[in-house]
């Protein structure tokens, strides 16, 4: 594997993973809020 390919792909994969993590966290918070709202 060419090191230049790793240098180019690493930040893209890191940014993509970070975005998925943040979106997933926000979605879980919304689901929890919706469930708690239904129970109240």
Swiss-Prot record:
Keyword 4Fe-4S attributed: no
Compartments, record wording: Cellular thylakoid membrane
UniProt superkingdom: Bacteria
Keyword Transmembrane helix set for record: yes
UniProt xrefs under Pfam families: PsbY
Disulfide bond entries: none
One annotated GO molecular function: manganese ion binding
Keywords tagged on the record: Membrane, Photosynthesis, Photosystem II, Thylakoid, Transmembrane, Transmembrane helix
Predominant subcellular localization, coarse grouping: membrane
GO terms classed as biological process: photosynthesis
Transmembrane segments: 5-23
Membrane topology designation: Single-pass membrane protein
GO CC terms in record: photosystem II; plasma membrane-derived thylakoid membrane
Assembly and oligomerization: PSII is composed of 1 copy each of membrane proteins PsbA, PsbB, PsbC, PsbD, PsbE, PsbF, PsbH, PsbI, PsbJ, PsbK, PsbL, PsbM, PsbT, PsbX, PsbY, PsbZ, Psb30/Ycf12, peripheral proteins PsbO, CyanoQ (PsbQ), PsbU, PsbV and a large number of cofactors. It forms dimeric complexes.
Described purpose of this protein according to its UniProt entry: Loosely associated component of the core of photosystem II (PSII), it is not always seen in crystals. PSII is a light-driven water plastoquinone oxidoreductase, using light energy to abstract electrons from H(2)O, generating a proton gradient subsequently used for ATP formation.
Family: Belongs to the PsbY family.
Protein name in the entry: Photosystem II reaction center protein Y
Naturally occurring in which organism (per UniProt): Synechococcus elongatus (strain ATCC 33912 / PCC 7942 / FACHB-805) (Anacystis nidulans R2)
């Amino acid at each position: 594997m060419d090191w230049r390919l790793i240098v180019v792909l690493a930040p893209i994969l890191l940014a993509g993973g970070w975005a998925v993590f943040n979106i997933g966290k926000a979605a879980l918070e919304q689901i929890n809020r919706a469930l708690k709202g239904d129970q109240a």
